[in-house]
């Protein structure tokens, strides 16, 4: 029984938050057809429905599956021929047993309709507060069994919400949530702009930019422990665009301390600052590759805004983008084979995907003003901010080009998303 995994889930304190509404935009007609049955229960029926509901929604949000429900609980001996006739390929069923006031036994099975075999089976002990978390974990396991790669459901998002308070005042919030926008938490509130939140590799810290002292400074917030916010030293001029090294010990920063915007590496323990670019042009928006041996950044050194890659071992810098006059805000895919970026098409700014080896650039969206792309941990999806009407929302597109779901707030704008690594 995997008690350790689940008895300590979701224990951080909620302050206040912006509720995001999730809208599934598209489903591919070729998506994998699967049925997620409500769990049979002994005790509390509602919790069994929650687990099935979360798994079902996760799969539909992925763009890879068409997950449906039934209005009854499927027992452990389903009629496979019936489901085969309905062109269902797999069935998820489970059982939930209440063993104390707030603790449950959870059992789950994934069945192949055609072979009639059990593809995955497991059981857990879970605290009431960990019900949604275990559903995300199980979604990842099922996704892996069916598609051969891990899902990105047991992860978190960070983003900035902006609310108009009237009389020209705005409230900025640094917020986090589960990958499906549930369990939202407000980490920081400010009347001054907050920008560029980015999760640390261990998911315990968030670096961001704040103007609370009437200048741009980089801070590190600890959302899950009672620890004082860490402010990086003040560097003359602008400090912006923080990005973590995979080892969690260094941050990339854009600084103008020498009069020109360049990329620097800042070592947190020694406070050592290393300059990585020296061009007379503006260099900004840098991020590391998954191994930390390369950085990608935006520069106007060619006379246009383009994306460049620097090899930190050889110090060689190569231009990565040649299509179009504007490419910016690039990030590496988890396998380092692709870059997601903002690409201008006419007067519109859209999310594009660049194959680094072939230089093939694919336009992924059809919006007017997209910004801040970031990959899911498994590389199958890209989250970004986009304008919708007079507001800003978060949207997700799969790397296959399907815009799968959207996160919006009735209270104001949502912008600058960042997707965490896998939770531990």
UniProtKB/Swiss-Prot annotation:
SUPFAM superfamilies with a match to the protein in the record: TolB, N-terminal domain, Tricorn protease N-terminal domain
Q: Where does this polypeptide localize?
A: Periplasm
Q: What is its main location?
A: periplasm
Q: Does the keyword Cell cycle apply?
A: yes
Per the UniProt entry, what are the Gene Ontology biological process annotations, in alphabetical order? cell division; protein import
Q: Which residues form the signal peptide?
A: 1-16
Q: Does the keyword Signal apply?
A: yes
Q: What keywords would UniProt list here? A: Cell cycle, Cell division, Periplasm, Signal
Q: Which GO terms describe its cellular component?
A: periplasmic space
User: Assembly and partners?
Assistant: The Tol-Pal system is composed of five core proteins: the inner membrane proteins TolA, TolQ and TolR, the periplasmic protein TolB and the outer membrane protein Pal. They form a network linking the inner and outer membranes and the peptidoglycan layer.
Entry similarity comment: Belongs to the TolB family.
Question: What's this chain's function?
Answer: Part of the Tol-Pal system, which plays a role in outer membrane invagination during cell division and is important for maintaining outer membrane integrity.
| UniProt cross-references to HAMAP family, sorted A to Z | TolB
- NCBIfam families reported for this sequence: propeller_TolB
Instruction: From the Swiss-Prot or TrEMBL record, give the protein name.
Output: Tol-Pal system protein TolB
Q: Which gene encodes it?
A: tolB
């Amino acid at each position: 029984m995997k008690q350790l995994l689940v008895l300590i889930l979701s224990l951080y304190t909620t302050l206040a938050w912006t509720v995001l509404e999730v809208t599934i935009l598209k489903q591919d007609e070729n998506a994998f057809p699967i049925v997620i049955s409500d769990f049979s229960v002994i005790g509390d029926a509602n919790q069994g429905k929650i687990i099935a509901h979360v798994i079902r929604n996760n799969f539909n949000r992925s763009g890879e599956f068409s997950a449906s429900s039934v209005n009854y609980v499927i027992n452990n001996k389903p009629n496979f021929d019936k489901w085969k006739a309905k062109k269902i390929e797999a069935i998820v069923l489970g059982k939930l047993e209440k063993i104390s006031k707030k603790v449950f036994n959870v059992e789950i099975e994934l069945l192949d309709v055609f072979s009639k075999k059990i593809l995955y089976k497991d059981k857990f002990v879970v605290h009431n507060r960990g019900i949604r978390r275990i559903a995300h974990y199980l979604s990842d396991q099922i996704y892996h069994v069916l598609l051969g790669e891990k899902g990105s459901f047991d992860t978190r998002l960070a983003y900035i919400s902006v609310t108009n308070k009237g009389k020209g005042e705005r409230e900025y919030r640094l917020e986090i949530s589960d990958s499906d926008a549930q369990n939202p938490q407000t980490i920081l509130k400010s009347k001054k702009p907050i920008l560029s939140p980015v999760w640390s590799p261990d998911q315990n810290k968030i670096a961001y930019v704040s103007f609370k002292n009437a200048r741009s400074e980089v801070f590190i917030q600890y959302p899950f422990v009672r620890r004082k916010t860490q402010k990086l030293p003040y560097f003359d001029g602008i400090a912006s665009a923080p990005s973590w090294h995979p080892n969690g010990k260094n941050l990339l920063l854009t600084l103008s301390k020498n009069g020109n915007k360049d990329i620097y590496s800042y070592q947190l323990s020694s406070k050592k600052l290393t300059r990585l670019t020296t061009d007379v042009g503006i260099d900004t928006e840098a991020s590391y590759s998954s191994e930390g041996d390369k950085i990608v950044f935006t520069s106007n050194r060619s006379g246009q805004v383009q994306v460049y890659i620097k090899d930190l071992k050889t110090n060689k810098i190569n231009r990565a983008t040649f299509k179009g006059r504007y490419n910016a805000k690039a990030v590496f895919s988890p396998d380092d084979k692709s870059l997601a970026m903002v690409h201008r098409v006419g007067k519109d700014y859209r999310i594009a995907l660049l194959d680094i080896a072939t230089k093939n650039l694919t336009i992924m969206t059809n919006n007017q003003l997209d910004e801040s792309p970031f990959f899911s941990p498994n590389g199958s999806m890209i989250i970004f901010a986009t304008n919708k009407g007079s507001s800003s929302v978060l949207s997700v597109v799969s790397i296959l080009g399907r815009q799968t779901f959207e996160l919006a707030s009735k209270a104001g704008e949502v912008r600058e998303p960042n997707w965490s690594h896998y939770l531990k």
